[in-house]
Amino acid sequence: MAPTAAVAGGGVEAEALLGLLQRVQSEALRAFGPNDFDPKLYVDLPLAADASAAAALASLPRAAPSRGEMEAYISRYFALAGSDLVAAADPPDFERDPPGFLPRVERAEARAWALEVHALWKDLTRRVAPAVAARPDRHTLLPLPGRVVVPGSRFREVYYWDSYWVVRGLLVSKMYETAKDIVLNLVYLVEKYGFVLNGARSYYTNRSQPPLLSSMVLDIYMATGDMAFVRRVFPSLLKEHSFWMSEVHNVAVMDNHGRVHNLSRYQAMWNKPRPESATIDEEFASKLSTAAKEKFYHQVASTAETGWDFSSRWMRDSTDMTTLTTSCIIPVDLNTFILKMEQDIAFFAKLIGESTTSEIFSEASKARHNAIDSVLWNADMEQWLDYWLPTDGNCQGVYQWKSISQNRAIFASNFVPLWLNAQHSGLEQFVDEAKSVRVMRSLQKSGLLQPAGIATSLSNTGQQWDFPNGWAPLQHLIVEGLLRSGSGEARELAEDIATRWVRTNYDAYKATGAMHEKYDVVTCGKSGGGGEYKPQTGFGWSNGVILSFLDEFGWPQDKKIDC
């Protein structure tokens, strides 16, 4: 297990605040009850008064405090959750209808809607209040130097992998400086903590998220040609790569030809309840022994690091959360993202004249390419499959590859390596056209293609990263991979999937007035559900993917936009 990380961002004082907020969270559950209870709300509360808040909490009745007593306590000692992120003035690079915006979107309803989605960037743009840096002991929010674009709703702070699709949308909106601000905020986190945090909160310092920082930098460079920006962020890309190459993330697997391959896994530095969901984690772990609880909490945090929290993908038994085994899984998508990172770093190093570094990372990407195809590729299914390590607790220096250890359940992640075809750093295509077509056929037969997009899995477990939910990032990764595969038929399928996704987003927006975090891909126009919190709106990555699809494919005058 990875070592437990101390809460960063304010040292002992930050730990003390978080401890207080978790006690408030627990007391609030007793006072308000479980219906519509969101534990994250309470660890996001800024402390408005001094440390007497702890004594006042202790003085509440030993029996469950009443609703009124709890409301009065919170009102007396805390500011509103999210009040330490202040609405920013309109970003200076925002224009209501920027020149060159979506020139191939011809249908009036489609264009009007796209402009409304574009305008949402104003609503989601924030600045961290100066009080956060002045009094870090009163905030779980971390200070950041630039403007931030938040996902929306309960997600009041910056999140790592969400930011990639926010950046993609901002580039379509010609908001290049705001896109750079987002990246520089993440670089600030790398410089301070050694990696990009899951999100900009002190309680997220124990884990990261799918690593897409280099992809953001590459897309911004391709849009702007800003070499100074590349030079500024390049050292942080190297630092982040080192984080993912650390011993706790690395796994060595020997194939049947005796070749040893190094791949990566998720591994949070935590073995306690997640502060933002502590009451939920404690309930799941209530019947476990102390040692089993620590293992469970570690797996829960590691699963949160995947971005897929939660899914049957990570469970030995999809009906039992305590069977999460994420740190014993070599994920297809994580290794895709790290290979892309290595390609990007090789490209940037060559660009800025560091030829030796470029060669090192080019070789690293080729080695990971071979590893992915040797360990994760399944020729019978024509898909890449997650690889499960033994879960008996016996760590091995090198694991012997076994066919039976590939997880043959079908997930959208099985097709994510196609996305490596879409990279623009001038290196060779990851999947040749013939293989891409075979993977496309496998996708068509998989059961994942639904009327409103690509389902996340085939298992309807009630978890949000399972059937029938579809998520914007997965649509985008697979569509871009198909699009750049070199096959005309794959391009047609890519456009068909994008069309389904645009239509369901449009109809849901017209029905609710909002963009949603996820969608039910069985029914066009229906938002998604499931998971440990209520469905959210806003929504950063959904907005970014819609703008990207409209930019890529346009929308002809004679093509209907609704379901």
UniProtKB/Swiss-Prot annotation:
A Pfam family reported for this protein in Swiss-Prot or TrEMBL: Trehalase
GO CC terms in record: plasma membrane
Keyword terms: Glycosidase, Hydrolase, Stress response
GO biological process: trehalose catabolic process
SUPFAM superfamilies in the cross-refs: Six-hairpin glycosidases
InterPro entries: 6-hairpin_glycosidase_sf (IPR008928), 6hp_glycosidase-like_sf (IPR012341), Glyco_hydro_37 (IPR001661), Glyco_hydro_37_CS (IPR018232)
Residues that, per the record, bind substrate: R154, W161, D162, N198, R207, S208, Q209, R274, P275, E276, G307, E532
PROSITE patterns: TREHALASE_2 (PS00928)
EC number in record: 3.2.1.28
Gene Ontology MF terms in the entry: alpha,alpha-trehalase activity
Record: active site: D309 (proton donor/acceptor), E517 (proton donor/acceptor)
Protein name, entry field: Probable trehalase
Lineage, highest ranks first: Eukaryota, Viridiplantae, Streptophyta, Embryophyta, Tracheophyta
